[in-house]
Amino acid sequence: MKVLWAALVVTLLAGCRADVEPEVEVREPAVWQSGQPWELALSRFWDYLRWVQTLSDQVQEELLSNQVTQELTLLIEDTMKEVKDYKAELEKELGPVAEDTKARLAKELQAAQARLGADMEEVRNRLSQYRSEVQAMLGQSSEELRARLTSHLRKMRKRLQRDIDELQKRMAVYKAGAQEGAERGVSAIRERLGSLIEQGRLQALTSQPLQERAQAWGEQMRGRLEKVGSQARDRLEEVREQMEEVRVKVEEQAEAFQARLKSWFEPMMEDMRRQWAELIQKVQVAVGASTSAPSQEP
């Protein structure tokens, strides 16, 4: 008989020990030390959950008034919004990254984000369930409910800690991919600028024949002007009018070429203007000599 009683006591003690889960300290995550908005929002949720887990008189009162679940709803929405915004910000910098890599990183980060959101929702739902259970007891002892809630919250905090660690890792990988994409974008810009500079150099080389044609045209015009200056004196007035028209055209065309060729054509234009002035002077001297000769005859 004593043996049976001893066996019964041992069985009961073993069952009690199996029901009581050993207290495991939850390591406080430090992922929000970098100060990103999504990490700060997550830290507010974590601190509030740690306060709820104390199940103090104030916590009990706010749980029964639905204030805790409402506050958790706001904290969850704020956290998920900040995570989404930060992810979108990193996606903008993933442009130059290969599409398959971008899709893989996005899928992994989305999965970590979904797990965290689901576990946060489960915490809120469990607290709402506790509120309903306490109200249904109608003044009876709720110690067993509080014990179960404490155990469940402890487990959920451990799961949330793993979710946070995983999300932190995925965010770090995503950020590294964004930085790599930004560096590739800068390299592409540098290559593009180098190509444009090379194109400009080639265009400068190909524009040299145009300068040579303009110079030949100027030489041709000077030859024509010299030929006009040697014509007969009775056509002097006509020659002057033609020379004036030619001068106007030459100046207009010279200005057009000067705008297109800029510094290349300016030295040649200055030379043309100088030779033109010398030619006019020669013509005027010749004309003056021809008009003074008859007046000196007896």
Swiss-Prot record:
The modification Methionine sulfoxide is found at residue 137. Residues 259-271 are annotated as: Specificity for association with VLDL. Pfam families: Apolipoprotein. Heparin binds at residues 155-158, 217-224. Residues 95-243 are annotated as: 8 X 22 AA approximate tandem repeats. Keywords: Chylomicron, Endosome, Extracellular matrix, Glycoprotein, HDL, Heparin-binding, Lipid transport, Lipid-binding, Oxidation, Phosphoprotein, Repeat, Secreted, Signal, Transport, VLDL. APOE is an apolipoprotein, a protein associating with lipid particles, that mainly functions in lipoprotein-mediated lipid transport between organs via the plasma and interstitial fluids. APOE is a core component of plasma lipoproteins and is involved in their production, conversion and clearance. Apolipoproteins are amphipathic molecules that interact both with lipids of the lipoprotein particle core and the aqueous environment of the plasma. Homotetramer. May interact with ABCA1; functionally associated with ABCA1 in the biogenesis of HDLs. May interact with APP/A4 amyloid-beta peptide; the interaction is extremely stable in vitro but its physiological significance is unclear. May interact with MAPT. May interact with MAP2. In the cerebrospinal fluid, interacts with secreted SORL1. Interacts with PMEL; this allows the loading of PMEL luminal fragment on ILVs to induce fibril nucleation. Belongs to the apolipoprotein A1/A4/E family. This is Apolipoprotein E. It comes from Cavia tschudii (Montane guinea pig). The lineage of its organism: Eukaryota, Metazoa, Chordata, Craniata, Vertebrata.
